[in-house]
C-alpha cells in the first residue's frame, strides 16, 4: 500500500510539469456561437428599442443623472432613455483587451481577446467540508480558501468575496479580505463594491502594495457591479462603478437575472434585456473616464417554474452564454460569465454533472473571465472545500483542451512508426520515452487504477480524495514573498481604518 502511494506521488510530481502553470489560458480553438447575423440584428434592435422606448432607472444618485443629461441622454426623474446607437457610440472608447496587473508581475492576466481565466466563486455566506458539514464562513475560512486558490495552478485569479467572513463586522470586512488577497496570494483580485469608501480603501491598499503611481496608471483591480434586473441600477452599485471608473480600474457590468422572474421566460428576450442594461451602464463608465476598462458580464439562471428555485447546468444557461459572447464581441468588450454552478448541497454526482455542464459551456462559448469556476454549492450560498479542488481539476482539463492539438512534425511521430512496425507496441518507443511526461493530461482527482488497487488504497470516493488533497495543500502552503515594509504598511492601514470605522482596535 505504501509503495502504491509512493508511485502515485511520483506520477503526480511528473505530471505537474504538464499542468497549465501560465497566469492565464490562451485559446487556440474557435468558439461556439448559437446566434446568426439575422438574430444578432434582431436582438440589437430590440435592445435599442428597450433603451429608447422604456429606458433604464438609475436610482438614488443625482450625479449619475446629471452626467447622462449633460451628455445628451433623455432624463425623466430617475428614468434615462437613449436614442438608438447612442450607447454604442460612447462604448467605443472602452479597450477590447487590457491587462489586470497582479502584485507579482508574473501573475498579471490579460482580460479579453484570446485569453481565458478561471476565477473562484463569489459571495457565499456558508462553507462546507465533508468532516464538519455546512456552517457560517469565518475569516479563517477566507484565509484557507485564499491559500487554496493561490496554490492551484488551474485557478488564474484570487477572486473577491470567496466567502463572506460573517464573524467580522460588515463595515470592516473589506479591509480584511483585501489584506488577505494581498498577503496570502500574489494573484490578481477583485475590489469591494458594497460602498464607495470600501472601494476607495481597496484602491489605497493596492497603492501601498504596488506603488501609488503604478496603480494610478494601470488596472490592478477587477470589480463586478450588478444591475437590479429588470432595467435598474441602484445607488450602491453606482457609487462603486463611479469610484473604480474614476480610478481607471476595471468595472464589470453583470446583470443578475433569474429567468422567468427578472426577465421574460425566453433566451431571446433575456438577451435583449441584458444587452440593454450592459450598454447603458458601460456608456456611463466611458462618460466618467473614456478608456476605463469595462467588461460585459452576465449571470443568468433560469427559474424552475414549478418551484421558483434557480436551476443550474441547464441547456438554456449554456445557450444564453453562447449568444451573449457574440453580443459582447460586437460591442468590442471582454466577456465575463459564470462557470461551475450547481444547486447540489454536497460534492456529489449532481454537483459534478451540473458544474461540468455549465463550465464546459462557458469554455466553449469563449468566456474570457469565468467566475464561480471553483467551489460552488447550493446555488452560491455555499463554498465547498472539496468542491474547490474537484472543480480546479476540471478547469485544468479544459485549459488543456482549448490549447488545441499539436500538429508539428515531432507530433506526427513517423520515426516511431518505423521503429515499432506492424504488430508492435509503442510503450518502449523512443518517441514515447521522450514525450511521456507531457503526452496526455493527467488530473489529480480521478482514480484510474484497477479495482484491486483502489481497494488496497482504502476504497476512497472522490470527495475523500479531495478532502485529503485540501489538507495536503494547506499543510504545504507557503506564502508568497512580500517586502516587510509593504506588509507593515498594509497591517497599519488595516488597523487605522478599523479604528476609524468602528472605534475599536483591529
PLM ranges: what are they?
Residues 2-22, 34-46, 54-55, 60-67, ...:
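Catalytic-core signal marking the mid-to-C-terminal active-site face
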Residues 360-382:
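Glycine-rich phosphate-binding active-site loops on the catalytic face of alpha/beta enzymes
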